[in-house]
Amino acid sequence: VSLIKKDIALRYGASVLSLKKEDILFHEGDTANFFYQVEDGAIKMVTYSLDGKEFIQGLFYQGDCFGEPPLFCDFKYPGSAVTLIESKILRIPKDRFFDLLKENFDVHLQLDRILCERLRYKNMILSEISFYDPEHRILSLLGYLKSKAPVSDQPFQVPLTRQQLADMSGMRVETVIRTIKRMEESGKLQIQDHKIFF
């Protein structure tokens, strides 16, 4: 379910961007001038270390909004937004987005809930990295990713590489590979054609 219905967004000056896989919507350090919502497709928010290592801050699917905090606090984007697949992104200019929030309290309240949920996720990741063994970290991360994906009666296909799972969970890729193999052997997940299903 989208935070902002498309007809309402269009009344506030929204446009829809069509992007290809691996297109960059905005870069870390850019000024935030728009509210963004996924109409179709998937986005990852990432930061990069000095040696080029990618850390995935979040994944966003159809109906999800992303990149809002800099709109409210006037700081630069702390990460880059990159498409995982071909995507359509709804975008509303910052000033019109604030008008929309002022005139639609239900949207404002729902956005508050979304931001609180993201804080909860960040807290979970910090706890996982600090206190738990690799299998627990991976199970928690896969459970979270599955909860964010569209509901399906099929096993959830993890849209990340083992390197990306390592980057999100604070582990080395070798540890993730060994742990996933053990989890497959114990029936906690499946691997088909090198893809992870949970």
What name fits each language-model region?
Residues 23-85:
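Cyclic nucleotide-binding regulatory domains
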Residues 146-198:
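Phosphate-/nucleic-acid-contacting segments
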Residues 7, 12, 57-116, 120:
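Cyclic-nucleotide recognition modules
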Residues 2-21:
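Short proline/glycine- and basic residue-enriched helix-capping loop/turn segments at helix->loop/beta transitions
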Residues 98-101, 121-131, 149-152:
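Short helix-to-loop capping/linker segments positioned immediately adjacent to catalytic or ligand/cofactor-binding
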Residues 141-145:
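Short amphipathic alpha-helical elements of helix-turn-helix/winged-helix folds
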Residues 19, 38, 198:
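Conserved catalytic Walker-motif region of ABC-type ATPase nucleotide-binding domains
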